[in-house]
Design a protein with these regions (language model features):
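Generic hydrophobic transmembrane alpha-helix motif, especially the helices
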Residues: 124-158
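C-terminal transmembrane helix and the adjacent membrane-cytosol boundary/short C-terminal tail
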Residues: 43, 247-272
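Alpha-helical membrane-interface segments at transmembrane helix boundaries
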Residues: 79-87, 120-127, 209, 213, ...
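Hydrophobic positions within alpha-helical transmembrane segments of bacterial inner-membrane proteins
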Residues: 93-101, 105, 109, 133, ...
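Cytoplasmic-entry segments and transmembrane alpha-helices of multi-pass inner-membrane transporters
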Residues: 103-136, 165-168
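Membrane-cytosol interface at the C-terminal ends of specific transmembrane alpha-helices
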Residues: 145-211, 262
């Protein structure tokens, strides 16, 4: 028998069509068009324009040329405001850590009842959801301009982040040590002191330093709205078009942030 006569090659027309594949193609095409429309609408809303960048380029060149040479005659003022910026970040972060530390044990599933856990977690999420600048405006209306409202705003927002990180570290401890102490009749406080805290203390310090890094940058931004520090005098010099002094502040901010990040990073790498 001829093999060619008995073979029944599969033809393209014999392959059953899959209606679902067509539906998927239509859905994907529709989704793609919607995404493109959203991006087009968003670009239009923010008035994105390469033409504006081109037309404004001479202004940018004037700004850059005005920054040189830097006016280092203000170094004493810059030093004072740099110290204030560090103090803002330090006090704000420390106050946040003091409050977040006990609350974090109330926000961990393995150290708090369910109803307390949900209440404290909701508080952490709520204060994290509100930006530091919004808190700053609230406290400025309360106590007036100056470093104090900026520090309070920084502290309140930091409580949410530190509390979340602290509580997650607590939930990640080795349960074996906890169960060992509980089996010999240790109280809840004793269990936290001898089984949980030794496991999370290095993480707490690391998270504190990490938040301090962030708050250095936050302190600069808060200064732009009247909280003092480098950001405040930066806004003043920008408003008076003293770009040679602005360059000094930009250099100072760059050195400050990079130095704090490097130092904090080394300490955290040794802790973890």
């Amino acid at each position: 028998m001829n093999i060619e006569e008995t073979s029944n090659p599969l033809k393209a027309s014999d392959i059953p069509s899959n209606p679902m594949s067509r539906v998927k193609i239509i859905l994907l095409a529709t989704a793609g068009l919607i995404i493109i429309a959203i991006y087009y609408w968003s670009f239009d809303a923010v008035e994105f324009s390469f033409l504006k960048l081109k037309d404004g380029f001479p202004n940018m060149m004037d700004f850059v040329s005005g920054m040189f040479p830097p006016d280092w005659s203000i170094y004493k003022l810059v030093l004072v405001e740099t110290i204030l910026t560090i103090q803002l970040a330090l006090i704000g972060t420390t106050l946040a850590a003091i409050i977040a530390f006990p609350l974090s044990f109330c926000a961990a599933r393995n150290t708090a009842p369910s109803w307390i856990y949900h209440i404290v977690r909701f508080f952490f999420n709520a204060v994290r959801a509100i930006d530091t600048l919004i808190f700053a405006l609230i406290f400025v209306a309360w106590v007036g301009l100056g470093p104090f409202p900026g520090m309070l705003a920084m502290a309140i927002h930091s409580i949410g982040m530190l509390g979340k990180l602290f509580s997650e570290a607590i939930e990640g401890v080795d349960p074996g040590q906890v169960e060992a102490l509980e089996s010999v009749g240790a109280s809840r406080i004793e269990t936290i002191r001898w089984a949980i805290f030794p496991q999370v203390s290095s993480y707490f310090i690391s998270y504190f330093l990490y938040r301090f890094e962030i708050n250095i940058r936050v302190a600069v931004v808060l200064g732009l709205v009247g909280a003092g520090g480098i950001g405040y005098i930066l806004s003043q010099y920008m408003g008076h078009f003293q770009y040679d002094r602005v360059s000094v502040l930009m250099i100072t901010i760059l050195v400050l942030v990079m130095s704090i990040d490097a130092l904090s990073g080394k300490i955290r790498s040794k802790l973890l």
